[in-house]
C-alpha cells in the first residue's frame, strides 16, 4: 500500500496543520458560494487523511493469533503448479487479503473488493484450475468461518463471483494438439453467496444437460 508514510521532513502534526488550513480556506469559500463540489472536496481530503492514518494499524497482522494466520493460510507453502497470473507469493497475498477483509469488516468498512485475476484458462486447464482452486479455497472458507465465529456474518454479505464462466466444451488455442482449455462463456456461470441474512444450502438456477 503506497503513501502510508509521510516524506522525510513532514511530521504528522505539520501535515494535519496544513490540512486544517486548506479545509478552512475551502470552508470559507463554500460559505460564500455554497458550491456542493467544495463540500465534497473537504470531505474527500478528510477521508483520505483518516485512511492514511488508520491503514498502518489495519494491515499489521502481528497481533493476530497464530491459529488465525494458519486457518487463512498465511505463510503456507505454495500449493505448487500454476503460472498464469502468478506473481511472487500469490497464494500468500490472497490469504492475507482475505484476513484483511475481516479486519476491515470489524472496523466498519462497508464495501470490500478482493481480486484474484488468474482464471484465464484458455489452455492448460487441468494444472491451472487445480492451482488456482488451491490458492483461494482455504482463505475464502476461513473468512466465512471467521466472520461467523465473531458474529459478523449475518450483517456481512460475502459474494464470490466472476464476470463470466467457461464453456462446457474444450478450446484449442496456441497450436496445441489437444483442447486443453475453455473459452469465455457469459451465458451460464455461477457465484457463491454467504451471510447477509441469506438462507444457506440453497441452489438457484440450473443449466441444460450440456451446460447452457
Q: Where do the PLM segments sit?
A:
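Ligand-binding pockets and gating/stacking loops
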Residues: 1-212
Amino acid at each position: 500500500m503506497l503513501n502510508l508514510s509521510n516524506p522525510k521532513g513532514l511530521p504528522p502534526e505539520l501535515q494535519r496543520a496544513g490540512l486544517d488550513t486548506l479545509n478552512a480556506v475551502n470552508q470559507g469559500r463554500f460559505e460564500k458560494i455554497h458550491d456542493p463540489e467544495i463540500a465534497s472536496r473537504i470531505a474527500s481530503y478528510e477521508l483520505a487523511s483518516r485512511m492514511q492514518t488508520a491503514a498502518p494499524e489495519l494491515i499489521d497482522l502481528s497481533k493476530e493469533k497464530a491459529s488465525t494466520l494458519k486457518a487463512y493460510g498465511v505463510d503456507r507453502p505454495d500449493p505448487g503448479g500454476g503460472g498464469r497470473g502468478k506473481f511472487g507469493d500469490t497464494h500468500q497475498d490472497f490469504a492475507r487479503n482475505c484476513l484483511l477483509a475481516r479486519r476491515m469488516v470489524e472496523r466498519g468498512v462497508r464495501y470490500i473488493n478482493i481480486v484474484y485475476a488468474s482464471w484465464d484458462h484458455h489452455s492448460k486447464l487441468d494444472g491451472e484450475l487445480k492451482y488456482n482452486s488451491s490458492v483461494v479455497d482455504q482463505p475464502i472458507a476461513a473468512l466465512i468461518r471467521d466472520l461467523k465465529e465473531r458474529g459478523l456474518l449475518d450483517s456481512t454479505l460475502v459474494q464470490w463471483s466472476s464476470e463470466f464462466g467457461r464453456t462446457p466444451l474444450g478450446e484449442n488455442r496456441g497450436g496445441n494438439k489437444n483442447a486443453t482449455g475453455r473459452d469465455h462463456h457469459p451465458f451460464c456461470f455461477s457465484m457463491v453467496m454467504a451471510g447477509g441474512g441469506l438462507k444457506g444450502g440453497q441452489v438457484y438456477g440450473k443449466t441444460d444437460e450440456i451446460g447452457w
